[in-house]
């Protein structure tokens, strides 16, 4: 039996101190892009969320080169998601002994990268393996309702 090699690596950043909606705005721009194109996009975007995402993309690429020995030119971001994390709650003292609650939102960012050169090799092997399950052809017959008299001519 052939041992299937992993073609995906990931980097996970937890408890990043920013809103999940603001991070999603940046993540939506880089999903499905190549590694080099992602770096250019993140360096030129003027959002605060770009820096932690850029660090995660670098980390995922380093994981791919170390764990799989893949080249960075073959990497594509296959999955990128942002989930809401815990909310840090603090109290700010105000006048006359009162306090004002401060809610600091956090998020968890996951970047999954796929090596397309390894994916192509295993895609060819799996397509050769699945030939025994053929789908039966279900050719539909065409009935002309107007020339045959329709359903109501049968008595």
Swiss-Prot record:
This protein binds specifically to 23S rRNA. The globular domain of the protein is located near the polypeptide exit tunnel on the outside of the subunit, while an extended beta-hairpin is found that lines the wall of the exit tunnel in the center of the 70S ribosome. It comes from the Eukaryota. One of its GO terms (molecular function) is structural constituent of ribosome. Its main location: plastid. CDD domains: Ribosomal_L22 (cd00336). It comes from Solanum tuberosum. Keywords: Chloroplast, Plastid, Ribonucleoprotein, Ribosomal protein, RNA-binding, rRNA-binding. Coiled coil: none annotated. Part of the 50S ribosomal subunit. It is found in: Plastid, Chloroplast. Signal peptide: none annotated. This is Large ribosomal subunit protein uL22c. InterPro entries: Ribosomal_uL22, Ribosomal_uL22_bac/chlpt-type, Ribosomal_uL22_bac/org-type, Ribosomal_uL22_CS, Ribosomal_uL22_sf. GO terms for biological process: translation. GO terms for cellular component: chloroplast; large ribosomal subunit. Belongs to the universal ribosomal protein uL22 family.
């Amino acid at each position: 039996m052939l041992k299937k090699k992993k073609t995906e690596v990931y980097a996970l950043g937890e408890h990043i101190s920013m809103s999940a909606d603001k991070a999603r705005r940046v993540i939506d721009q880089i999903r499905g892009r190549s590694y080099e194109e992602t770096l250019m996009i993140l360096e030129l975007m003027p959002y605060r969320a770009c820096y932690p995402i850029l660090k995660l993309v670098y980390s995922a690429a380093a994981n791919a080169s170390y764990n799989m020995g893949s080249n960075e030119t073959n990497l594509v971001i296959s999955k990128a998601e942002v989930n809401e994390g815990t909310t840090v709650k603090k109290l700010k003292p105000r006048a006359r002994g009162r306090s004002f609650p401060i809610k600091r939102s956090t998020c968890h960012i996951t970047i999954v990268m796929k090596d397309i050169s390894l994916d192509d090799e295993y895609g060819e092997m799996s397509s050769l393996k699945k030939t025994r399950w053929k789908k039966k052809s279900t050719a539909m017959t065409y009935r002309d309702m107007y020339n045959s008299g329709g359903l109501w001519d049968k008595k």
